[in-house]
Amino acid sequence: LGDVYKRQVNNSYEAKFHYPRTLSKDDYDRLGGDVGFVGMWEKERCDSILYLANHGIKVRIFGNKQWQKYKNYSPNLQIEDHGLHSEDYSKSLKAFKISLCFLRKMNFDQQTTRSVEIPACGGFMMAERTKEHQAMFEENKEAIFFSSNEELLEKCKYYLEHEKERKKIAEAGLKRCQTSDYSNEGMIKNVLNSIFQTIK
């Protein structure tokens, strides 16, 4: 019969798992920091993180074994010996003052699961600038975007010094996730509604 309906959908988050936790001092100590990234090593994201560390930004990484070769690279770079899963993953996205969102270059990604998981968990997201990211979140109001290491550094410096602005943007990003139905349930609901409208 062929395809009767096609629609591209964005990444989504699980509302019962990705939501803002109340964090203790221990949570912030174990899982937080100035700038953080949770994820696998890739050359491009590694280059960006090393650029930040080389210019005085403290970055903490939870990831796979390939990050370990940089463990003693810089006093500004804290490489943990494990990734994060379960509740600690969601907590960390909020515990960092700035949570970085990198895209897989080999996949030509325009967005990733962290594009919605970070703001859904109440985190302040700094992500690579793409058309899809800009469609999902209003730039400088619901998320912060960058297109170069120089811009990334400039914005990290600025927002580390402006806590009120960080919190306002994080709150707006969370609200956008909720009101735009970026959850798994919301995404399925919107797809089904679109299908029903098409076949009427």
Model-derived segments and their meaning:
Residues 7-10, 58-63, 101:
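A structural signal for short, well-ordered beta-strand segments and their strand-loop junctions
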Residues 8, 73-200:
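Catalytic binding pocket for nucleotide-activated donors in carbohydrate/polymer assembly enzymes
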Residues 14-95:
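Conserved catalytic-core segment of nucleotide-activated headgroup transferases in glycan assembly
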Residues 9-13, 39, 63-65, 129, ...:
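Residues at the C-termini of beta-strands that transition into short coil/loop
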Residues 1-5:
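Short, small-residue-biased leader/transition segments that mark boundaries at the very start
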